[in-house]
From Swiss-Prot:
GO biological process: translation
Signal peptide segment: none
Record key words, sorted: Ribonucleoprotein, Ribosomal protein
Subunit structure: Part of the 50S ribosomal subunit.
Family the UniProt entry places it in: Belongs to the bacterial ribosomal protein bL31 family. Type B subfamily.
The protein's name: Large ribosomal subunit protein bL31B
């Protein structure tokens, strides 16, 4: 086998940026940042979502997102007034008295 073809597999500290939850897992993630966790120094990777903040695992229905697309949208359009819904208009067929509608033609 060729040497130096595979990335280095090592223990990496993953930190959930929304909850602060930390866990160590084997990974090939490359970083220069390090952090001390449980007395050992690990390379660190900051993630936006993990099992401690994902709605599937937490059971909550709301997703905590740090400045996501929804927040940007709400900031942009928060000053716009929402128009009142338009009332529905009912259109009825009005025929003069004594006239009947012709029956619909059947297709063959």
């Amino acid at each position: 086998m060729k040497k130096n073809t595979h990335p280095e597999y090592r223990q990496v500290l993953f930190v959930d940026s929304s909850t602060g939850y930390k866990f160590v897992c084997g990974s090939t993630y490359q970083t220069d940042k390090t952090e001390v966790f449980e007395g050992q120094e690990y390379p660190v990777c900051y993630v936006s979502i993990s099992s401690s903040s994902h709605p599937f695992f937490t059971g909550s229905k709301k997703l905590v997102d740090a400045e996501g697309r929804v927040d940007k949208f709400l900031k942009r359009y928060s000053g716009i007034k929402q128009s009142a819904p338009k009332p529905e208009t009912v259109v009825e067929d009005v025929l003069p008295k004594g006239k009947k509608k012709s029956p619909a033609k059947k297709k063959k």
